[in-house]
């Protein structure tokens, strides 16, 4: 910075000065003085904006710019070459694109002062520059940086970690909340680049807000109010999400507040092609600051445009919410989209559907095809709505020559159907039914803490002892594979059971019969999928003896009781050990009387069982040690803390 400011002192009058630096001085608020000194006292003749990956190694991640200026004040246009888009897979194109005149821009540096802070936006057209005559968005809405707790591990939880009866949902005023009963409040914390609705993942312990680094106590008037939130890491796009209220907000999930009608106009603008133009210019780093958004010019729509925008926004938010709630990480998740509701099932049983539908009802493939079409329709409708909104805002800002309304598939942030993912999530839902988290008889969460209500379960009764073994053979009647087969039969009917199991197995992939494929999935892949869905904060805990699969069992964290390990040891670990002893005895007899070729196969089985028996023997000692401690857990402490209490007997979180 010192050298940039002093550069004219090192040059003769009318002499030329050149630099190669990063581009931060051109845009960031902290460099305003640098820009003012340079733009007022020097005449820029050329700029080459290389973007990232000009150099090899770590320095290649930095956006590089080269420029030449003259120690004079001349009223002439500078020439700039913009190569920022030629990166990643297009890096090799930088050289040739330097000579492509479509990448050339010509600008008067005096025009940069049209924008507060004078960012060097050499590629802005006159129309974009003129738009800065409009007031900033900060005059239209209250845009607020979020709070910092100072210790997220202590004060934040994923909502799935807690007792759901202790979360204060849908509150509009903090005074409505008894923090001794419901200390946890939903919390915006950014997340993936998702538009319109979603990323409802965290809750904050508001009963401890007095310990936060910065609780934004001067902003109490916007606590829990409807807003728009976004992720501060935006890259080359911007994604606003509508919130109906009931949330606190993090510095990573800052918010804009206004009346509801204004919020709808604002989120339409945020998620249009207009906002990224300004965000990129006002702060080209990957982090979007509150101050940058406040400076974006706000051009008000006319009455007709206003009504059209609100209609489109309402529909698009609703569609996005429907998609978000179709996955189990949403607290408004009702049931898996491939599972018929209890009402549909009753109608089916009383023959209220057409004959053709009744024939298809028991086939998972039919439900998947319906879901696939629903996803496709939703995706296409959101894209159509976004293109209509783009048309409106492009017209409002007069940027028809700059932008097209077209939206690419990659920019639509709802998910399409995916057979493998959706079958794996169906299995996860089934496991939830086995534990009582979900029920086929009620929509939504049946149990996630609080009081157990047995009346919610009639079609499938949850596992009574909260321990479901995962075996590589039929050792237990309530083994997870057997339970899953029974679940599929109950949901879709016995007539289509084998067909449905094959459909599931084909989606999972693998060798063997459908039941073998499903069993192998539970043994090898289910828990990895679970950790991914729940972001390494599992609600089903895998008790695991090790690599030989001597013993595996799932436990639902919200139903954990202090005597669980003692029951697991006597009812499952000891039972498994006895089965190994019995099998090994039978194998020894069989080997003695087997032919040479059979003996090879049987000996291999014997070795596997011996290794499993040895592994479970060592595991039993660890379980015994912990069982004697009669450990209790508090869900408020979070998965990270509670899981560690049983680290010696649980699968590693990877």
Q: For each predicted feature, which ranges?
A:
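Proline-centric
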Residues: 7-12, 253-264, 275-323, 332-365, ...
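Short Ser/Thr-interspersed hydrophobic loop/turn segments at strand-loop and sheet-helix junctions
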Residues: 221-239, 249, 266-280, 527, ...
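A generic secondary-structure signal for well-formed alpha-helical elements
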Residues: 11, 15, 24-25, 38-46, ...
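Secondary-structure capping and boundary motifs in well-ordered enzyme cores
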Residues: 23-26, 30, 58, 222, ...
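Signature of N6-adenine DNA methyltransferases within the class I
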Residues: 1-174, 199, 209, 214-218, ...
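Terminal accessory regions of large proteins
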Residues: 330, 337, 350-353, 361-366, ...
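Flexible, glycine/threonine-enriched loop-and-boundary segments that flank and lead into catalytic domains
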Residues: 1-4, 50-52, 156, 160-189, ...
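Short coil/turn segments at secondary-structure boundaries
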Residues: 138-154, 170-172, 199-203, 279-286, ...
């Amino acid at each position: 910075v010192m050298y940039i400011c002093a550069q004219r002192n090192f040059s003769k009058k009318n002499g030329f000065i050149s630099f190669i630096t990063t581009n931060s001085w051109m845009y960031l608020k902290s460099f305003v003085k640098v820009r003012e000194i340079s733009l007022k006292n020097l005449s820029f003749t050329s700029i080459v904006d290389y973007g990232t990956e000009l150099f090899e190694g770590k320095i290649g991640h930095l956006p590089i710019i080269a420029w030449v200026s003259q120690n004079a004040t001349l009223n002439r246009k500078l020439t700039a070459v913009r190569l920022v888009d030629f990166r990643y897979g297009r890096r090799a194109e930088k050289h040739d694109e330097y000579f492509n005149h479509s990448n050339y821009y010509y600008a008067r540096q005096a025009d940069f002062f049209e924008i507060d802070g004078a960012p060097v936006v050499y590629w802005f057209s006159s129309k974009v520059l003129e738009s800065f005559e409009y007031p900033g968005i900060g005059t239209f809405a209250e845009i607020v940086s979020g709070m910092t707790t100072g210790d997220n591990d202590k004060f934040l939880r994923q909502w799935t970690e807690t007792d759901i009866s202790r979360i204060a949902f849908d509150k509009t005023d903090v005074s409505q909340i008894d923090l001794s009963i419901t200390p946890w409040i939903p919390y915006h914390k950014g997340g993936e680049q998702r538009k319109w609705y979603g990323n409802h993942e965290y809750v904050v312990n508001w009963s401890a807000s007095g310990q936060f680094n910065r609780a934004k106590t001067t902003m109490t008037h916007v606590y829990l109010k409807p807003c728009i939130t976004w992720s501060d890491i935006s890259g080359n796009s911007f994604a606003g999400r509508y919130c109906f209220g009931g949330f606190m907000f993090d510095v990573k999930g800052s918010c804009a507040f206004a009346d509801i009608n204004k919020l709808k106009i604002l989120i339409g603008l945020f998620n249009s092609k207009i906002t990224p133009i300004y965000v990129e210019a006002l702060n080209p780093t990957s982090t979007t600051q509150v101050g940058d958004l406040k400076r974006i010019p706000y051009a008000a729509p006319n009455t007709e445009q206003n009504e059209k925008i609100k209609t489109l926004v309402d529909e698009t938010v609703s569609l996005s919410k429907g998609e978000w709630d179709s996955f189990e990480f949403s607290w408004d998740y009702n049931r898996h989209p491939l599972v018929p509701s209890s009402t549909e099932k009753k109608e089916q049983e009383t023959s209220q559907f057409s004959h053709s539908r009744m024939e298809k009802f028991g086939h998972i493939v039919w439900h998947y095809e319906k879901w696939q079409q629903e996803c496709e329709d939703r995706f296409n409708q959101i894209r159509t709505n976004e293109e209509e909104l783009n048309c409106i805002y492009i017209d409002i800002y007069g940027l028809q020559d700059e932008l097209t309304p077209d939206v690419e598939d990659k920019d639509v942030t709802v998910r399409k159907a995916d057979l493998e993912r959706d079958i794996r999530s169906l299995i996860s839902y089934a496991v939830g039914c086995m534990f009582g988290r979900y029920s086929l008889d009620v929509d939504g969460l049946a149990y996630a803490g609080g009081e157990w209500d047995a009346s919610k379960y009639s079609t499938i009764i949850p596992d009574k002892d909260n321990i479901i073994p995962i075996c590589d053979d039929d050792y237990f009647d309530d083994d997870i594979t057997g339970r899953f087969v029974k679940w599929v039969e109950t949901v879709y009917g016995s007539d289509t059971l084998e067909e449905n199991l094959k459909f599931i197995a084909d989606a999972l992939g693998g060798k063997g019969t459908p039941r073998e494929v499903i069993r192998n999935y539970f043994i090898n892949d289910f828990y990895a999928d679970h950790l991914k869905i729940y972001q390494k904060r599992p609600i089903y805990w895998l008790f695991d003896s090790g690599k030989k699969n001597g013993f595996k069992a799932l436990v639902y964290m919200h139903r954990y009781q202090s005597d669980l390990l003692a029951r697991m040891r006597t009812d499952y670990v000891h039972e498994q050990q006895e089965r190994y002893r019995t099998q090994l005895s039978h194998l020894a007899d069989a080997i003695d009387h087997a032919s040479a070729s059979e003996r090879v196969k049987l000996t291999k089985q014997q070795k596997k069982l011996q290794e499993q028996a040895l592994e479970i023997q060592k595991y039993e000692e660890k379980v015994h040690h912990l069982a004697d401690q009669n450990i209790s857990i508090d869900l408020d402490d979070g998965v990270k803390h509670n899981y560690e209490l049983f680290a010696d007997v649980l699968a590693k979180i990877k």
